[in-house]
Protein backbone atom coordinates (compact mmCIF):
# COMPACT_ATOMS: atom_id res chain seq x y z
CA UNK A 1 0.00 0.00 0.00
CA UNK A 2 1.52 3.33 -1.05
CA UNK A 3 2.52 5.78 1.65
CA UNK A 4 -0.20 8.46 1.53
CA UNK A 5 1.93 10.85 3.57
CA UNK A 6 4.85 10.97 1.14
CA UNK A 7 5.74 14.38 -0.31
CA UNK A 8 4.85 13.06 -3.76
CA UNK A 9 1.38 11.88 -2.71
CA UNK A 10 0.68 15.04 -0.71
CA UNK A 11 1.61 17.22 -3.70
CA UNK A 12 -0.42 14.98 -6.05
CA UNK A 13 -3.48 15.37 -3.82
CA UNK A 14 -2.97 19.15 -3.65
CA UNK A 15 -2.76 19.37 -7.44
CA UNK A 16 -5.75 17.13 -8.16
CA UNK A 17 -7.95 18.72 -5.50
CA UNK A 18 -7.29 22.09 -7.16
CA UNK A 19 -8.17 20.82 -10.65
CA UNK A 20 -4.65 20.55 -12.07
CA UNK A 21 -4.21 17.53 -14.40
CA UNK A 22 -0.46 17.24 -13.91
CA UNK A 23 1.73 15.07 -11.73
CA UNK A 24 4.30 16.29 -9.21
CA UNK A 25 6.92 14.35 -11.19
CA UNK A 26 6.24 16.28 -14.40
CA UNK A 27 6.22 19.64 -12.58
CA UNK A 28 9.46 18.83 -10.76
CA UNK A 29 11.06 17.73 -14.03
CA UNK A 30 9.91 20.98 -15.66
CA UNK A 31 11.44 23.00 -12.83
CA UNK A 32 14.77 21.14 -12.89
CA UNK A 33 14.89 21.32 -16.69
CA UNK A 34 14.29 25.06 -16.86
CA UNK A 35 16.76 25.66 -14.04
CA UNK A 36 19.44 23.57 -15.75
CA UNK A 37 18.89 25.53 -18.99
CA UNK A 38 19.79 28.76 -17.22
CA UNK A 39 16.32 30.18 -16.53
CA UNK A 40 17.38 31.34 -13.08
CA UNK A 41 15.27 31.19 -9.96
CA UNK A 42 12.78 34.05 -10.41
CA UNK A 43 9.52 32.85 -8.86
CA UNK A 44 7.25 34.68 -11.32
CA UNK A 45 8.99 33.19 -14.36
CA UNK A 46 8.77 29.70 -12.81
CA UNK A 47 5.08 30.15 -12.02
CA UNK A 48 4.45 31.30 -15.62
CA UNK A 49 6.12 28.16 -17.01
CA UNK A 50 4.27 25.95 -14.51
CA UNK A 51 0.93 27.57 -15.43
CA UNK A 52 1.22 26.06 -18.91
CA UNK A 53 1.10 22.57 -17.40
CA UNK A 54 -1.45 23.40 -14.71
CA UNK A 55 -4.02 24.52 -17.34
CA UNK A 56 -5.80 26.83 -14.88
CA UNK A 57 -4.44 29.61 -12.69
CA UNK A 58 -3.09 28.10 -9.45
CA UNK A 59 -4.60 29.11 -6.14
CA UNK A 60 -2.51 30.32 -3.22
CA UNK A 61 -1.85 26.85 -1.80
CA UNK A 62 -0.54 25.53 -5.13
CA UNK A 63 1.46 28.73 -5.76
CA UNK A 64 3.06 28.43 -2.32
CA UNK A 65 3.90 24.77 -2.94
CA UNK A 66 5.47 25.64 -6.31
CA UNK A 67 7.56 28.44 -4.81
CA UNK A 68 8.64 26.10 -2.00
CA UNK A 69 9.58 23.46 -4.55
CA UNK A 70 11.65 26.03 -6.42
CA UNK A 71 13.50 27.03 -3.25
CA UNK A 72 14.29 23.38 -2.57
CA UNK A 73 15.59 22.89 -6.13
CA UNK A 74 17.64 26.09 -5.96
CA UNK A 75 19.28 24.79 -2.79
CA UNK A 76 20.05 21.43 -4.39
CA UNK A 77 21.44 22.83 -7.62
CA UNK A 78 23.59 25.49 -6.00
CA UNK A 79 24.94 23.38 -3.14
CA UNK A 80 28.13 21.36 -3.27
CA UNK A 81 26.18 18.08 -3.19
CA UNK A 82 26.45 16.11 -6.37
CA UNK A 83 22.86 14.85 -6.60
CA UNK A 84 19.29 16.09 -6.64
CA UNK A 85 16.29 14.49 -4.96
CA UNK A 86 13.68 13.45 -7.52
CA UNK A 87 10.04 14.06 -6.63
CA UNK A 88 8.70 10.57 -7.39
CA UNK A 89 6.41 8.02 -5.74
CA UNK A 90 7.95 6.10 -2.85
CA UNK A 91 9.45 2.63 -3.26
CA UNK A 92 6.30 0.98 -1.91
CA UNK A 93 4.28 2.15 -4.96
CA UNK A 94 3.93 -0.32 -7.83
CA UNK A 95 6.94 -0.36 -10.15
CA UNK A 96 4.68 0.52 -13.09
CA UNK A 97 3.49 3.67 -11.27
CA UNK A 98 7.05 4.65 -10.38
CA UNK A 99 8.24 4.02 -13.95
CA UNK A 100 5.37 6.11 -15.35
CA UNK A 101 6.27 8.96 -12.97
CA UNK A 102 9.93 8.66 -13.97
CA UNK A 103 8.92 9.04 -17.61
CA UNK A 104 6.74 12.05 -16.72
CA UNK A 105 9.67 13.60 -14.85
CA UNK A 106 11.83 13.23 -17.96
CA UNK A 107 9.09 14.70 -20.17
CA UNK A 108 8.83 17.68 -17.84
CA UNK A 109 12.61 18.09 -17.79
CA UNK A 110 12.91 18.07 -21.58
CA UNK A 111 10.02 20.56 -21.86
CA UNK A 112 11.48 22.91 -19.25
CA UNK A 113 14.92 22.69 -20.77
CA UNK A 114 13.59 23.26 -24.28
CA UNK A 115 11.55 26.31 -23.25
CA UNK A 116 14.58 27.97 -21.70
CA UNK A 117 17.73 26.76 -23.47
CA UNK A 118 17.14 29.10 -26.42
CA UNK A 119 19.57 27.64 -28.94
CA UNK A 120 22.54 27.55 -26.58
CA UNK A 121 25.51 25.52 -27.75
CA UNK A 122 25.78 22.23 -25.90
CA UNK A 123 28.75 19.94 -25.39
CA UNK A 124 28.56 16.40 -26.71
CA UNK A 125 28.06 15.18 -23.12
CA UNK A 126 25.13 17.56 -22.60
CA UNK A 127 23.53 16.45 -25.87
CA UNK A 128 23.90 12.84 -24.77
CA UNK A 129 22.19 13.57 -21.44
CA UNK A 130 19.26 15.19 -23.26
CA UNK A 131 19.01 12.23 -25.65
CA UNK A 132 18.98 9.89 -22.65
CA UNK A 133 16.19 11.88 -21.02
CA UNK A 134 14.10 11.78 -24.19
CA UNK A 135 14.65 8.02 -24.47
CA UNK A 136 13.74 7.44 -20.80
CA UNK A 137 10.55 9.47 -21.20
CA UNK A 138 9.44 7.14 -24.00
CA UNK A 139 10.10 3.77 -22.36
CA UNK A 140 8.18 4.27 -19.15
CA UNK A 141 6.06 1.10 -19.54
CA UNK A 142 9.03 -1.14 -20.39
CA UNK A 143 9.93 -2.05 -16.79
CA UNK A 144 8.41 -5.27 -15.47
CA UNK A 145 7.52 -6.10 -11.87
CA UNK A 146 10.58 -8.22 -11.16
CA UNK A 147 13.95 -7.96 -9.47
CA UNK A 148 15.50 -7.02 -12.81
CA UNK A 149 12.82 -4.38 -13.40
CA UNK A 150 13.39 -2.97 -9.91
CA UNK A 151 17.14 -2.93 -10.47
CA UNK A 152 16.73 -1.19 -13.85
CA UNK A 153 14.46 1.42 -12.28
CA UNK A 154 16.94 2.15 -9.49
CA UNK A 155 19.79 2.44 -12.00
CA UNK A 156 17.86 4.94 -14.14
CA UNK A 157 16.77 6.90 -11.06
CA UNK A 158 20.37 7.19 -9.83
CA UNK A 159 21.46 8.40 -13.26
CA UNK A 160 18.72 11.06 -13.21
CA UNK A 161 19.87 12.28 -9.80
CA UNK A 162 23.25 13.33 -11.23
CA UNK A 163 22.91 13.74 -15.03
CA UNK A 164 21.03 17.07 -14.90
CA UNK A 165 23.87 18.53 -12.85
CA UNK A 166 26.10 18.31 -15.93
CA UNK A 167 23.63 20.51 -17.81
CA UNK A 168 23.32 22.91 -14.89
CA UNK A 169 27.08 23.26 -14.51
CA UNK A 170 27.47 23.80 -18.25
CA UNK A 171 24.63 26.25 -18.83
CA UNK A 172 23.38 27.76 -15.61
CA UNK A 173 25.85 27.61 -12.74
CA UNK A 174 27.15 31.05 -11.87
CA UNK A 175 30.83 31.39 -12.57
CA UNK A 176 33.02 31.31 -9.50
CA UNK A 177 34.51 34.72 -8.80
CA UNK A 178 38.08 35.06 -9.96
CA UNK A 179 40.53 34.88 -7.08
CA UNK A 180 41.90 38.24 -6.08
CA UNK A 181 45.57 38.62 -6.84
CA UNK A 182 47.68 38.42 -3.75
CA UNK A 183 49.96 41.28 -2.85
CA UNK A 184 53.58 40.34 -2.27
Curated annotation (Swiss-Prot):
Coiled coil: none annotated. GO terms for cellular component: cytosol. Belongs to the UPF0149 family. HAMAP family: UPF0149 (MF_00346). This is UPF0149 protein PP_5201.
